């Protein structure tokens, strides 16, 4: 499988040059020289005069995010990326965000060149997906719920500072690794218990206070609890 880290860096560096400009002759020549280091001769010609000295704006790139890289032929890859620009026109400054796709050819020795000009693409939006919320199992009796809740509260109070040896008393098979952070346990949030043979599964959020940042940190866990006969 192709390592795409190099392609990602290549695209990011190209985008920083491509979307940065000002309307002086020297700056435009410097931009042209920079982007020509990434483009085929055909694309170099295509981009002549895209930024000219009579353009009323200047642009600074504030961020580039590569969202995806996929194979698009034997040795060609399609990269989708988002660019944040700060556009200045006279005394007015605005922030602009847009998503584009380019295609990158990669030689056998790893050399790269862009073979498709930046082409507008749909923005990457937040998905509407919501995971199905598990429902509490009525077969888990009240005593078991109380015992399990008490166990979880005890465990998470010590978990923040517990050593690997101390965790071994509560946890089997390194299911939870030591964190050794200055957290203060606050509360369990909406624990949902379900039967799993002789065991009980729990899905729970745990609130901690981070004593360094003073922010509340909410961690989510899915655990299987086993009660020893003794």
Feature roles, as predicted:
Residues 75-77, 111-112, 198-200:
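Hydrophobic residues embedded in beta-strands of well-ordered beta-sheets
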Residues 70-108:
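Non-transmembrane, low-complexity coil segments enriched in Pro/Ser/Thr that form solvent-exposed tails
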Residues 2-57, 127-180:
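Core segments of small alpha/beta cavity-forming domains
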Residues 16-17, 80-88, 203-209:
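Generic short beta-strand segments
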Residues 92-135, 216-230:
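Short beta-strand edge/turn micro-motifs at domain boundaries
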Residues 50-69, 178-193:
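A short, amphipathic edge element
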Residues 144-230:
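Extracytoplasmic/luminal low-complexity segments enriched in Pro/Gly and acidic/polar residues
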Residues 3-8, 70-72, 195:
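Short, solvent-exposed beta-strand/turn "edge" segments of beta-rich domains on protein surfaces
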């Amino acid at each position: 499988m192709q390592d795409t880290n190099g392609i990602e860096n290549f695209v990011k560096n190209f985008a920083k040059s491509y979307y940065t400009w000002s309307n002086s002759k020297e700056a435009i020549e410097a931009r042209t020289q920079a982007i020509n280091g990434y483009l085929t001769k055909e694309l170099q010609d295509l981009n002549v005069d895209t930024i000219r000295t009579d353009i009323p704006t200047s642009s600074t790139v504030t961020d580039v995010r590569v969202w995806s890289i996929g194979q698009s032929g034997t040795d060609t890859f399609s990269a989708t990326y988002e660019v944040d620009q700060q556009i200045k026109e006279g005394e007015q400054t605005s922030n602009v965000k847009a998503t584009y796709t380019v295609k990158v050819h990669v030689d056998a020795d790893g050399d790269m060149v862009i073979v498709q000009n930046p082409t507008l693409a749909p923005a990457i939006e937040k998905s509407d997906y919501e995971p199905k919320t598990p429902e509490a199992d009525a077969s888990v009796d009240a005593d078991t719920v109380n015992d399990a809740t008490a166990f979880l509260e005890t465990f998470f109070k010590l978990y923040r500072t517990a050593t690997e040896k101390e965790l071994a008393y509560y946890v089997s098979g390194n299911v939870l690794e030591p964190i050794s952070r200055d957290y203060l346990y606050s509360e369990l949030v909406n624990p949902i218990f379900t039967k799993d043979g002789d065991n009980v599964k729990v899905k729970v959020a745990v609130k901690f206070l981070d004593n360094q940042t003073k922010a509340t940190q909410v961690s989510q866990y899915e655990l299987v609890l086993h009660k020893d006969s003794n």
